Amino acid sequence: MLRKWMPLTMTMILLLVGAAACQKAITTDQSNTTEETMRMTTQEKMDIFLTRRSIRKYKPELPSQELLDKVLEAGTYAPSAMGKQSVTIVAVTNRAVRDQLSQLANKARGGDADQFYGAPAVFVVLADKSLSSNYLQDGALVVGNMQNAAHALGLGTCWINAAKGIFELEEGQALLKEWGLEGDLVGGACCIIGYPDESHETAPRKDRYVIHVD
């Protein structure tokens, strides 16, 4: 009887061993695929930072509110000194207000061109200096977050250094009141945003940009 069952038993053992080997091969292949995907994802994430450019020519179409909200959300999660969150972002998509801000920028800086390079929307970054002595740094971090998020979503941005001058004007102060904003607010930046209508290569990085002290 034992001899009768031995061939069947050996067959079952061989089948089990073969199945285990196949499963190991599948698991190994899946592991390799996952590692490869992770490497690609890491590089893609890095490319967001390495390929972002300042855009100074835009298509007239206004991006969807969904896209703009994602960029704004990224801005709200920027670091702030001691977690004070001294920054307020005013998202301007109203064309008349956008044009008014451009005119005020011309008045503050001198000039008569569109200070916003045709971008259909402007994110005004304000900071309350009564909340933090690092309000300017807080604002810079918010703009950086929004610029990188916008690039990741296929949008273009440019930092326009006009907000301080705009909101030192009487007309700028009147806008703050109209928007219901209070506090010791200072204009940090105007981050223009829209669909890019240009592309350009990265300028070479300067020598000794990074100094290592090991």
Where are these regions (language model features)?
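Acidic, surface-exposed loops and disordered segments
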Residues: L2-M10, L14-D214
